[in-house]
């Protein structure tokens, strides 16, 4: 039975990937529902994986890719619809950019373990929640976008700093471990 349970989180993440693909082509009337379903799958995939003890590195990667793809698809769709400024996007995804840069750096210096061992953080969960709140705000209350953007960017900046510090500490530990081995 556990084998089948292990599939559910990945199916939910895959559903979010599918939603990322259809979002740009969906009528505005469906945007809110697609965002809500995407947010629900984001919550449920991790919750199910932890609850049923079926977490995996590959599932975590699929979840992260699905999150980023959906967020970028939604934000670019809003830009194309004239509802969101393109120059706001880097600020909204600052945490994601930080993690991507850290992963690239880890790969270049062949120190993948320092990146691979970084798990989900509370700051990342708050930043993701802020991003989904921003998407809902764009659809439901466009006049509140500046306030939602400020909150989202603040959460994203805190998460970027948190992940950056964690990566730096992991690199330092790894370097210390290498020096300790004769």
Segments from the language model and where they lie:
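Membrane-embedded alpha-helical segments that form the functional core of polytopic membrane enzymes
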Residues: 11-60, 74-79, 83, 88-90, ...
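A feature for the membrane-embedded catalytic helix bundles of lipid/isoprenoid biosynthetic enzymes
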Residues: 2-6, 32-33, 64-182
């Amino acid at each position: 039975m556990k084998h089948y349970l292990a599939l559910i989180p990945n199916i939910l993440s895959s559903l979010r990937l599918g939603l990322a693909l259809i979002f740009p082509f969906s009528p505005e009337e469906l945007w809110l529902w697609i965002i809500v379903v995407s947010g629900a799958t984001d919550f449920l995939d991790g919750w199910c994986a932890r609850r049923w003890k079926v977490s995996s590195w590959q599932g975590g990667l699929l979840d992260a890719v699905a999150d980023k793809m959906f967020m970028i698809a939604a934000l670019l769709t809003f830009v194309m619809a004239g509802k969101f400024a393109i120059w706001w996007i880097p600020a909204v995804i600052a945490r994601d950019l930080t993690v991507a840069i850290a992963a690239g750096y880890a790969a270049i210096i062949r120190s993948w373990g320092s990146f691979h061992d970084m798990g989900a953080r509370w700051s990342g969960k708050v930043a993701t929640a802020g991003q989904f709140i921003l998407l809902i705000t764009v659809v439901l209350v466009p006049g509140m976008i500046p306030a939602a953007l400020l909150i989202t960017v603040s959460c994203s900046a805190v998460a970027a700093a948190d992940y950056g510090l964690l990566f730096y500490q992991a690199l330092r530990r790894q370097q210390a471990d290498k020096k300790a081995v004769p």
